[in-house]
């Protein structure tokens, strides 16, 4: 099994005097979101073995902040190809990974991140807000075999859904969902049954599971 974590960069600082989209840094809110997601990914039992990030400053800062918060120790590489990339181009970067890693986090942009998630699970509309993370499990032994439609979406969460006291409850819910999806994939592989239709997961609201949702961020 290979696991892909698609992490959209955190909210960027539009007021930063950079004069260059590539150099735009994270806003304070973006840093906070990246820290939340770094801790959550580790709590959800999927700390990445390796990371790939866009060369944009906001993406590199997102990875660095999330890795520090989550205690990730795996190596990371910067890929210029992930900046203004197509979903297919990012997929090629993933396929080029070496098989000693089972979980890889990919830090990128919109609409590429949501497009790649949809491509991997075989279709469906997926929306990734800033600093949102999508976990996709692919029942293969080699990254080279990761292909469109072969993945199963285990979860998709924005940072606004994560309150500090909600981590444990969410972890239990996610563990159950992951186990159920794995069993479904394994059963389908054994009997050659058609895969489940792609689905859009129910969105969790900003600020916690009981709070109203927030607006999507505009930038990529």
Where are these regions (language model features)?
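Residue-level preference for the first positions of well-ordered beta-strands
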Residues: 4, 101-105, 133
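Active-site-proximal alpha-helix that buttresses catalytic centers in soluble enzyme cores
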Residues: 1-80, 85, 89, 125-127, ...
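Non-catalytic, charged low-complexity extensions flanking SF2 helicase motor domains
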Residues: 175-203
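Short, glycine/serine-rich, charged loops/turns that create anion-binding
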Residues: 11, 56-58, 111, 140, ...
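A glycine-rich beta-strand to alpha-helix segment
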Residues: 102-118
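Long, low-complexity, intrinsically disordered segments
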Residues: 196-220
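Domain-level recognition of soluble alpha/beta enzyme cores
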Residues: 124-159
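Glycine-rich phosphate-binding loop signature in dinucleotide/nucleotide-binding domains
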Residues: 44-46, 97-102
């Amino acid at each position: 099994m290979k696991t892909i974590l698609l992490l959209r960069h955190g909210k960027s600082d539009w007021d930063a005097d950079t004069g260059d989209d590539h150099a735009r840094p994270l806003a304070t809110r973006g840093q906070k979101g990246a820290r939340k997601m770094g801790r959550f990914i580790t709590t959800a039992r999927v700390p990445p073995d390796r990371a790939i990030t866009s060369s944009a400053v906001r993406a590199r800062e997102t990875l660095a902040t999330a890795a520090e918060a989550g205690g990730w120790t795996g190596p990371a590489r910067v890929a210029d190809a992930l900046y203004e990339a197509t979903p297919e181009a990012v997929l090629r970067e993933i396929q080029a990974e070496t098989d000693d890693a089972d979980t890889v986090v990919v830090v990128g942009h919109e609409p590429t991140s949501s497009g790649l998630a949809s491509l991997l699970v075989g279709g469906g509309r997926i929306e990734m807000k800033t600093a949102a993370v999508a976990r996709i499990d692919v029942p293969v032994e080699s990254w080279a075999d990761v292909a469109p439609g072969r993945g199963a979406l285990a979860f998709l969460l924005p940072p606004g859904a994560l309150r500090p006291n909600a981590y444990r409850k969410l972890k239990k819910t996610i563990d159950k969902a992951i186990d159920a999806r794995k069993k479904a994939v394994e059963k389908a592989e054994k009997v050659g049954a058609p895969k489940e239709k792609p689905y859009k997961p129910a969105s969790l609201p900003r600020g916690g599971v009981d709070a109203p949702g927030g607006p999507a961020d505009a930038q990529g």
